[in-house]
From Swiss-Prot:
GO terms for biological process: translation. One of its GO terms (molecular function) is structural constituent of ribosome. Keywords: Ribonucleoprotein, Ribosomal protein. Belongs to the bacterial ribosomal protein bL35 family. HAMAP family: Ribosomal_bL35. InterPro entries: Ribosomal_bL35 (IPR001706), Ribosomal_bL35-like (IPR021137), Ribosomal_bL35_CS (IPR018265), Ribosomal_bL35_sf (IPR037229). Gene3D superfamilies: 4.10.410.60. The lineage of its organism: Bacteria, Pseudomonadati, Pseudomonadota, Alphaproteobacteria, Hyphomicrobiales. This is Large ribosomal subunit protein bL35. NCBIfam families: rpmI_bact (TIGR00001). It comes from Chelativorans sp. (strain BNC1). One of its GO terms (cellular component) is cytosolic large ribosomal subunit. Pfam families: Ribosomal_L35p.
Length: 66
């Protein structure tokens, strides 16, 4: 049976930590920042950890990183 391929789109957007959790950049900071609150901009600055159901979905697309 051939090796499973990793989805390139998922590989570019998600990082797996040493403990197996998935980090992703917070959404909503591409354009239209005038109408966003300062609190929203501040909170979206860093990365966030995906929830368990979302992590399960990402694992299917990155078979060799867990």
């Amino acid at each position: 049976m051939p090796k499973m391929k990793t989805k390139s789109a998922v590989k570019k957007r998600f990082k797996v930590t040493a403990t197996g959790r998935v980090k992703v950049q917070a959404a909503g900071k591409r354009h239209g920042m005038i109408k966003r609150s300062k609190k929203f901009i501040r909170n979206a600055r860093g990365t966030m950890v995906l929830s368990d159901p979302d992590t399960k979905i990402v694992k299917q697309f990155m078979p060799y990183s867990f």
